[in-house]
């Protein structure tokens, strides 16, 4: 999605693609090309089962982030984007009870609080490393996406799982956890649009990417199944991985430069029609 958007702007693009089996670490260790702009989107990640079940695998992200930041400084790349995550926010702020919006200032890199699992620690460390790279002259935008989704998302994530269940017309409709946990959903096209708008505005530092709207998994299931034209019974699995209870952004910084356009309902319709 990002590649397509940049290509549409006429950029000359070089990709280091992990999916092809290449070792991105080797690229950052040995390549000395100076680019005008660099994006770091790569990470070992997956759904909740992957984050909880493979902490050492996810920890590999630390090496990737470190070599990327060193490469930025070594090559003198003047402008860069680091995709962090909402998982970097302290889990203590994402507990049951009233929904608390997460502000960029809730992460203090001088006094770091417990983030969400190894994945959150890796992203938090990546943000710390970005600060060191900035001190060496590279201006870095740190994007903190919340619950990104889209029509072509990997099926290990909740959104495509819900879409597939609705396409099969599952009844009962299975939901991991109580169904009351909330997430802040933002479509991949809006994530891409927001990132480029922030770059155009020459923004640096951390920016939340989200709508600022709390949607429970029960509500997501109802939206998806209503769009699919049926109303199943919801079946909750308390034994399945659940993650934090609430994760919702305060998107004020983003909204100064970009307003998302694809509602969750529209995103669901697109996915069901794919």
Regions found by a protein language model. Name each.
Residues 1-11:
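Canonical Rossmann dinucleotide-binding motif of NAD(H)/NADP(H)-dependent dehydrogenases/reductases
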Residues 11-30:
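Adenosine-cofactor binding site in Rossmann-like domains, unifying the SAM/SAH pocket
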Residues 16, 38-44, 80-86, 143-145:
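SDR active-site strand-loop-helix element
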Residues 27-62:
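NAD(P)H-binding glycine-rich loop region in Rossmannoid oxidoreductase-like domains
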Residues 66-116, 141:
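Conserved Rossmann-fold NAD(P)-dependent oxidoreductase catalytic core, especially the SDR/UDP-sugar
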Residues 92-101, 124, 128-184, 188-199, ...:
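NAD(P)-dependent short-chain dehydrogenase/reductase
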Residues 118, 122:
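Active-site helix of classical SDR
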Residues 167-274:
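C-terminal substrate-binding subdomain of Rossmann-fold SDR/epimerase-dehydratase oxidoreductases
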